[in-house]
Amino acid sequence: MDVKIEQSWKQRLIPEFEKDYFNQLISFVKEEYRQGTVYPPGPCIFSAFEHCPFDKVKVVNLGQDPYHEPGQAHGLCFSVQDGIPFPPSLVNIFKEIESDLGKPVPQTGNLLRWADQGVLLLNATLTVRAHQAGSHQNKGWETFTDAVIHHLAEERSHIVYILWGAYAQRKGAFINTSRNLVLKSAHPSPLSAYRGFFGNKHFSKANDYLIATGQTPIEW
């Protein structure tokens, strides 16, 4: 199957694209787009990869599911398109950046500026039916995104993995902590942000590690 995805990722993921689960997944996703509203827009499904080639990845931030309301999701976890109000988790992310780094809350919740610096903003599930959180879970996306993380874990080192919440921490449990920095805390959701997300200083810790390993820090 010819999948439109950034070339450096494509060459590594071709074996995945040939597997039965992936063909079943794509058939399911195509039918979902045909029958109703699905987010993100089709051309944005693999945006995280387009903006962050394999060899440029410095930070991996694992999310779970795309936003499921109009205009929000555009292929990067936690990010929303320009002009869209910030969802609660993103509000809390910006609050932590302000507390950690002293940076004011930005005008836009579009995190493409992070992706273009080497932050892979990867949801475990890359599509969702409108207004139905989790509606495309357990259809195959998780297997695909596991393969993505395995390629990074096997071929690259000195990457910062940011794992917020139990789901992301389970998904990243196999990552080698001696060759990478793995940062874990509660999720920025209002349900859990006060149980360990606020004050985690993950943004400064990530940059300190990047500098220590000879890399350029991220302008969060």
Segments from the language model and where they lie:
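Generic N-terminal amphipathic, Lys/Arg-enriched alpha-helix
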Residues: 1-13
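A polyanion-binding, active-site-adjacent surface
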Residues: 3, 15-163, 167-170, 175, ...
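Short, conserved glycine- and acidic-residue-centered signature motifs
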Residues: 199
